[in-house]
């Protein structure tokens, strides 16, 4: 809506996109929940709130109305849409109950199934989920888990049964609760229940160890041999993440980082100056790094390895460009977390960091794509 050309996709030669990944979207959305849903997108995807507010005319509430609206506007790419499960749950259950992690009632499950049927009749391709547990690496605007992060198995299987009944559609799921055996077991249960393709996020290569991507691919091969239609979505990006602390949430597996990076820009600045919160970040640094390694979606990596890429066009910070946070910390005799926070504050949270390029092994990428 704020970019009908889907510019970033087009820049990379993508001509068709699927909207609503990871369970979040803008329909169905009650009128009084519109602004809250935009705040969620601001937090999770760094889309400026003002851009959304100006670019979205909100001439819909339901999925059929949204798809009709999407059909009317000019677009630069082809699009299809998932049912965003977080939006569906909030619409039916209310935010408070959905956020509490309570299972849906029988009547709520029936209504969610009805709305999924209705949406697929109107053109949806299936439904999507992000389930990353209470310490989700990608939290909501207020720092709480996304609705689907703490969604129970039975509520997901209720939607899977809709696809099985229709023999139509597919499921995109990012499942990473920290218990890999339980996660794998649930994906197999989900595939058995739906009997429709499951798009598993994400298989990503390391630079040197091929077992990092071969292990999950062997599991997927085994699933296919059992008749379970599970497919891997593979990460083949050739660069690390570039980000500023004004818009960054992929350290959310760390409660200390989550506390500091939620709220308005002014609130974030105040928190980053707070001695107690800074100390909590430093004290939790090793634990945060461990969690980010366990939860694969923690793509930012260890803050020590981040490289300063942009400094808000400030001449007084230019000397830091091209240096790693760890090297700056060693030179200044400071903790690397202090360096990251201090540079960000000096640059009005617009200092840009570049994460490590963890997957640029062309041989491994080709192996995944040709599997």
Language model feature labels by segment:
Residues 4, 57-61, 65, 74, ...:
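Conserved active-site and cofactor/substrate-binding residues in soluble primary-metabolism enzymes
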Residues 15-17, 77-81, 125-126, 169-170, ...:
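Structural motif
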Residues 2-127:
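Divalent-metal coordination cores built from histidine and acidic residues
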Residues 96-103, 116-120, 124-255:
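Functional cores that coordinate and move charged inorganic groups
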């Amino acid at each position: 809506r704020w970019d009908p050309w889907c510019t970033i996709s087009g820049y990379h030669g993508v001509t068709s996109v699927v909207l609503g990944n990871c369970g979040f979207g803008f329909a169905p959305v009650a009128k009084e929940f519109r602004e809250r849903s935009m705040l969620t997108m601001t937090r999770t995807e760094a889309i400026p709130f003002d851009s959304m507010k100006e670019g979205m005319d909100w001439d819909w509430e339901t999925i059929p109305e949204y798809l009709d609206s999407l059909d009317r506007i000019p677009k630069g790419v082809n699009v299809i849409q998932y049912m965003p499960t977080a939006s569906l749950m909030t619409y039916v259950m209310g935010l408070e109950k959905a956020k509490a992690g309570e299972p849906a009632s029988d009547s709520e499950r029936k209504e969610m199934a009805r709305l999924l049927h209705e949406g697929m009749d109107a053109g949806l391709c299936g439904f999507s989920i992000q389930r990353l547990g209470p310490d989700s690496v990608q939290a909501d605007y207020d720092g709480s888990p996304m609705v689907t992060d703490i969604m129970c198995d039975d509520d997901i299987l209720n939607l899977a049964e809709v696809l099985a009944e229709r023999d139509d559609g597919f499921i995109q799921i990012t499942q990473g609760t920290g218990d890999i055996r339980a996660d794998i077991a649930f994906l197999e249960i989900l595939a058995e229940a739906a009997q429709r393709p499951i798009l598993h996020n994400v298989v990503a290569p390391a630079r040197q160890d091929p077992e990092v991507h071969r292990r999950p691919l062997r599991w997927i091969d085994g699933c296919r041999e059992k008749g379970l239609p599970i497919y891997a979505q593979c990460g083949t990006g050739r660069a690390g993440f570039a980000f500023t602390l004004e818009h960054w949430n992929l350290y959310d597996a760390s409660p200390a980082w989550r506390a500091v990076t939620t709220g308005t820009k002014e609130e974030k600045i105040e928190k980053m100056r707070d001695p107690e919160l800074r100390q909590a970040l430093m004290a939790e640094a090793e634990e945060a790094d461990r969690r980010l390694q366990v939860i694969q979606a923690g793509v930012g990596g260890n803050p020590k390895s981040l490289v300063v890429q942009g400094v808000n066009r400030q001449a007084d910070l230019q000397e830091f460009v091209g240096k790693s946070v760890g090297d700056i910390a060693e030179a200044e005799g400071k903790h690397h977390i202090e360096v990251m926070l201090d540079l960000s504050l000096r640059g009005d949270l617009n200092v840009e960091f570049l994460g490590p390029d963890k997957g640029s092994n062309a041989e491994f990428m080709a192996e995944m794509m040709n599997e």
